[in-house]
Amino acid sequence: PIWSSASVGGLPLEKYPGFTQKLGQDTFIRAKTSGAEMIKKKTGAGFAVGVSIAEVVHAIALDGKRILPVSSVQRGCYGLREVALSVPTVVGRGGAEQTLEVELWPKEIQALKRSGAVLQETLGKVLAEAN
């Protein structure tokens, strides 16, 4: 999770009364697993996905130049190349037009790079098995 840019009412989350690293980690895990949990309970997560897709389509169709957390193949953002990751991206008529590097804590950059390496390794294995 990227906590360095998270805020509530303009106050950095790490300074928010009652916020702890444990609470942040618990919240992250719950958010990460909630989609699967909703599907298990047969309530589905389709509405949220539909809203997100509508936002992206709207930004493209109207050349909205919206900053959205969309996945695209990285070409240097945070030193990452040839791996698809979700980062803040300007979305307009040309699709994912520009990725934006927000300031991250060093440990967040390292975690992002580890994620990129894991994705590249997994993709390599999938492609090797497909051939």
Model-derived regions, located:
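C-terminal substrate-binding/catalytic lobe of Rossmann-fold NAD(P)-dependent dehydrogenases
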Residues: 1-131
